[in-house]
Amino acid sequence: MKLLEERIKKDGVVLPGNVLKVNQFLNHQIDPELMYKMGEEFARLFKDEEITKIITVESSGIAPAVMTGLVMKLPVVFARKHKSLTLVDNLYTSDVYSYTKKVTNTISVDKKFLTSDDKVLVIDDFLANGQAVQGIFNICDAAGAEIKGVGIVIEKSFQEGAKIIHDRGVRLESLAVISSFDDNQVHFEGEE
């Protein structure tokens, strides 16, 4: 998605450890117009799939997931990372290691929001080592839900995340695919 790539080039900051900071429009401050355009693109890419629900992990996956849900007219569920007084039992859970935060969270989804009748589209902000997506896969497997596809805003193709998805035979669509951060610059796949 050219618009997203341009925004990453303009506002993204490469940090040590192959981390891309996109706080200007995705991970702290949100650009709703850009999120909506991403939602439209995910909806276009997955329009022929029989999806009943969109699922993501809090918190940065929520904005693109909600916009995709808005365009596709589908409910959105997000896996919670933190315990809550309102979310205590009857949960699907999975442990997820965060590449950028270097911590393990137990994500959870209330069983009433994900069932074996669901055909889900996973939407998330980044795909690096694939741990968040693997956690969602674990939750969907426990629920008996069918995973129809994964939509990623920014994929780092030089890390292992895509392999986890492809090994499952699940369709992956990424709006921006980064091939490297050479010289602290973002380089996209297909660039010369």
Curated annotation (Swiss-Prot):
Q: Which domain of life is it from?
A: Bacteria
Presence of the UniProt keyword rRNA processing in the record: no
Pathway as given in its UniProt record:
Purine metabolism; XMP biosynthesis via salvage pathway; XMP from xanthine: step 1/1
Q: Which family does it belong to?
A: Belongs to the purine/pyrimidine phosphoribosyltransferase family. Xpt subfamily.
The subunit structure is: Homodimer.
User: What does it do?
Assistant: Converts the preformed base xanthine, a product of nucleic acid breakdown, to xanthosine 5'-monophosphate (XMP), so it can be reused for RNA or DNA synthesis.
Under what name is this protein listed?
A: Xanthine phosphoribosyltransferase
**Can you name the source organism?**
Ligilactobacillus salivarius (strain UCC118)
